[in-house]
Amino acid sequence: STGPMGEMPNRFETIDESRSNLKKIGLEATARNIAKTWFILGDKAKYFDICIQAGKETSIEAADNALIAIKKWNGIDNLELIKNKTLIIWGDKDKSYNFEQVQTLKKNIPNSSLVIFKGCAHNVHLEKNEEFNKTVLNFLRNGTK
């Protein structure tokens, strides 16, 4: 689950800001700040704590290296090489990936379908899990959204 490029336009903060925060305020506080943007209800979301727990399973060095790798990554030229039917899922309130990123995926991945979940942020699978599961199951069974 990713967008076509690492340095995401209009992300809630730049990759460099995330790296700086990681060093200034530490891993757990940075993870909390980032994970809050993944849910409509922020840190009050039902599954917020599992995101924080996952963040605690890494180190500052590993998190920083991941951010460095993300910043440099660009997969736009490879999207057309995806030959499988592809389901693109996006929450209309996502602060990590804007709609332009999603449109780039849809435009450049042949045989792709786009499903937009209303009232969801980045973690569609956790915010509307039943609807998400039905959508994915239908796609796997029928190849359609």
Residue ranges of predicted features:
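Conserved alpha/beta-hydrolase catalytic His-Asp/Glu region
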Residues: 7-13, 24-80
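Hydrophobic "lid"/C-terminal helical patch
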Residues: 34, 67, 105, 132-136, ...
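Catalytic active-site module of serine/aspartate enzymes centered on a nucleophile-bearing elbow/loop
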Residues: 112-145
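Active-site nucleophile loop of the alpha/beta-hydrolase fold
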Residues: 1-7
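Active-site acidic short loop of glycosyltransferases
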Residues: 83-84, 111
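Conserved alpha/beta-hydrolase "acid-adjacent" motif
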Residues: 95-101
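Short beta-strand/loop motif that positions the catalytic acidic residue
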Residues: 82, 88-90, 94
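Cofactor-binding loop segments of dinucleotide-utilizing enzymes, especially the Rossmann-like FAD-
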Residues: 2, 91-92, 119
